[in-house]
Amino acid sequence: MTGREILHKMKESVKEKVGLGASASSADSGKGKSKMLKQITHGFHLVKGKAFHEMEDYVVAKFKEVDDNELGLFAIFDGHLSHEIPDYLCSHLFENILKEPNFWQEPEKAIKKAYYITDTTILDKADDLGKGGSTAVTAILINCQKLVVANVGDSRAVICQNGVAKPLSVDHEPNMEKDEIENRGGFVSNFPGDVPRVDGQLAVARAFGDKSLKMHLSSEPYVTVEIIDDDAEFLILASDGLWKVMSNQEAVDSIKGIKDAKAAAKHLAEEAVARKSSDDISVVVVKFQ
């Protein structure tokens, strides 16, 4: 085994230990649970799509102790024309969020600032990371009581409350932000048979990276806070490989009867494949009960 192969194997081992999941193989999965409230569990599952490139979906799913607090850190990063940028986000975005001095007092502001700092760094490192980009949806569960969700792009977060699906993210579609894009000097294409695209290229209006389009794109996240009470049953984070073929309520209904979070995530991914999704698919499920 060469030195390069040994280093690669060490990196993959570290990723598995800290709860990161991403692979060029056909499927990858994992699970974990809170030490604070053992009934809160998480599971994830990834399936590579049919495109002839490396897997571009990356996942974070882990619990982390910070001083006397416990944080659940969950994320989906869906790359486009890049696996380096979602991989970078896996390693650095939560780290940057938690570095913000006002995180505990004002998590929404801290997250917005960290998203901006992280995107700026990605653009500065374009020679190394490439000129592609990535969507993101992140969820931070603070002491099993408060959930702070942020997103850019079309990776989505949905919470199930008393059997009803409630979106905690916004799909940043180009048509929804057409005025802002045009004010920055860009345009939104609407060709027959195709989705709306920024400058005729990108199907989302907000993303990390995409240096060649950045003047016309935003990386400012939509942020929302949800208190986890007795009504909260579970949370789903997923890339658009799932949401292209399944509505929020269909996804919730599909796993209501599945107690194990990892099995629930796998079921959703497999159902998306059965519905002819050809994209990379990544799913995180967090069970609150």
UniProtKB/Swiss-Prot annotation:
Essential cofactor(s): Mg(2+); Mn(2+)
Annotated binding of Mn(2+) 2, by residue: 78, 240, 279
InterPro entries, sorted: PP2C, PPM-type-like_dom_sf, PPM-type_phosphatase-like_dom
Amino-acid positions noted as binding Mn(2+) 1 in the UniProt annotation, renumbered to this chain: 78-79
Keyword Signal: no
MF annotations from Gene Ontology: metal ion binding; protein serine/threonine phosphatase activity
CDD domains hit by this protein: PP2Cc
A GO CC term assigned to this protein in UniProt: cytosol
Swiss-Prot/TrEMBL catalytic activity: O-phospho-L-seryl-[protein] + H2O = L-seryl-[protein] + phosphate; O-phospho-L-threonyl-[protein] + H2O = L-threonyl-[protein] + phosphate
Pfam family, one: PP2C
Enzyme class label: hydrolase
Cleaved signal peptide residues: none
E.C. code: 3.1.3.16
PANTHER family, per database record: PROTEIN PHOSPHATASE
Protein family membership: Belongs to the PP2C family.
Protein name listed in UniProt: Probable protein phosphatase 2C 39
Species name: Arabidopsis thaliana
Lineage: Eukaryota, Viridiplantae, Streptophyta, Embryophyta, Tracheophyta
